[in-house]
Amino acid sequence: MTTPTSTGAPVNILVVDDEGNIRKTLAICLEAEGHHVTAVGNFQDAVAEASRRTFHMAFVDLRLGVESGLDLIPVLLSGSPWMKIVVITAYASVDTAVEAMRRGATDYIPKPFTPAQVLLAVRKVEEVRTLEQKVAALREDLERTAPEVRFSSESPGMQRAM
C-alpha cells in the first residue's frame, strides 16, 4: 500500500455529516479552493465512498444520527491508513477530543466553525502529506545508497556490543 502523492494538487476530501447544510457549506468552502469534495450523510455511505475512491482527508461529524463518527475513524483508516481525519462537532468536549485523537483523528474542530478554520485544517494536512513524502523519499535514498551493513565478530566483547 502506497501513500498518495502530494504535488500541490487538489486534495480529495470526504465530508461526512448528517446535516445537509453542513455538508453543503463544507463542499462550497473546499471546492472554492480547488479541492475535490465528496459529501455523504451517514456512516454506510462514507464507508462505501472510501472503498471506491482514494481520499487524502475526511471531515467527520462526531454524531451521525444514531451512529458515531468516532466509530467511523478506525474503519476509514483501516482502508486508507494515510488518510487524515478531522472531527467536527457541535458537542465538543475534552473527552471526545481525546477519544477522537486516540482513534486516529488528526484534528478536531467545534461547530460552529469558520471557513478559515476549515482551510487551516486542510493546509495542515497538505503540510503533513508533503513531509511524509519527503521522509519516504529520504528513506528510499538511504536504503539505495547505504544498504544495511552487518558486522560479525568472534570476540565475546564485540558480540555483546552489537
Question: How should these model regions be labeled?
Answer:
Residues 20-38:
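Two-component/phosphorelay signaling modules centered on CheY-like receiver
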Residues 23, 65, 89, 93:
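The feature encodes the CheY-like receiver
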Residues 34-43, 49:
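Short hydrophobic/Thr-rich beta-strand motif most characteristic of the beta2 strand and flanking loop
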Residues 42, 68-71:
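Acidic catalytic/metal-coordinating carboxylates
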Residues 48, 70-82, 99:
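Short amphipathic alpha-helix used as the core "switch/output" element in two-component signaling
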Residues 53-59, 64:
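Active-site beta3 strand of CheY-like receiver
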Residues 139-162:
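AAA+ ATPase active-site-proximal loops
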